[in-house]
C-alpha cells in the first residue's frame, strides 16, 4: 500500500505510474477523499476544543453556584455535531482505505515502460538449447504415451485443468520439490516452513491478493478464508503486525505448498498439460530485509532460483517485466523462463519480485534498528524456487528420447533410487461398465 502522504505529495508521479501500468484507477477520487477526511478532522478537532471550553464554563459556573444550563445546552449541541461528523468521517475513511488498497505499487525507475509481456527485455540467458534429431513432443503427449499423466480421469474426478500423476511422474514430482528444498535450505540459507494452506482475508489483503484479485481465488464457502494461491501469502504474513529486532534481518523463508487458482481470464490458454493448472505444487522463497538491502536481495533471490535450473541443466533466460506486465505489489520483477522444446519457446517458471515496503505497510511489518529507534517498515521480496509442475514439464521435454522415454537428470537420480530412464508404465487392468 502506498502512504497517503506520499500520494498527496507525489500525485502526478502516482498518476504516471498508473498510466504506465495501463491501470485505469481513478486517483482523483482518492485525492478528494483525502481532502474531505482532513477537512472533517479539522472540523471535529475545532468542535472538541469548543466542547472543552463549554465544559470549563460549566465547571466554573457550578463552582460559583451559577446557572450552567446555557453552557450545558451548548455542550450537548456541540456533542451532537461531533457525533454526526465522526460518523461521516468513519464512512469517508472506510472508502478511502478501500481505494488505497486498490492502488498498485510504484515501479522502480529501472523498470522498462511497455504494454505487455511482448515488451519485456531479455536480461541474460543460460544453457545451450538442445537440437533434437527428431520432432520434440510436448510433455503431456510424452506423459500420456508413457501412461504416467492422466488428464481424462482427472477430468472425470475434478474437471478441466487437473491431472493424475502416476508412478514415475509422481516420483519425479516428489524428487523435484525435495531437491529444490534441499538446495534452498542447505546451500542458499533459507529456513524451511510448512505453513497453513487455508488463509484468512486479512493475510490475502496483506500481500495484495485482496481486494483486487478475489475472482481468481478459491474461497471457503461461508467464511472469510481462502485456499492459498501461493506460499508467498502465509510466508509474508508470518510477521504481520509485529516489530522485529533489526539484528535478525534478513530473514529468508522457503516452503513447498499446493497452490489453488481459478485461472480466471485464461480460457483457451494452455488447456492441455501442466503449465496452467487449478492445483499445482510450488516451492516459494520469501525474504524480509532492511530497506537499503532489498535491491541486492532481489539479485540474489533471482540467482537462487536460477541455480535450480542450472543444476538441472535446463536452458533458460531472464527477462525484466515491463510496466504493463509487472505484478500489482511489485516494484521490480525478473521472470525466469525455461526453454520448452515441444513448444519451441520459453515459458515462465519463476517470478522474483522486490515489493519494497508495499506489502509491509499493508501487513504492518516493521523493525527497529536499535532499541529506542522509531520503527521502520521492512522490505519484502518473493520468488518461485520453482513452480514444480512446470519444472517437471521442462524436464520431460528437454530430456526426452526418440522412443518417448525420459532421461532422469543426474542431480535427481539419488532421489529416485538411482533410476536413469523413465519408461512406459504397465497399464492397470480395468473393465469399463456399460
Q: What residues fall within each predicted segment?
A:
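N-terminal alpha-helical targeting/anchoring segments
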Residues: 1-129, 144, 148
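TRNA-recognition modules of translation machinery and tRNA-sensing kinases, especially anticodon-binding
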Residues: 125-434
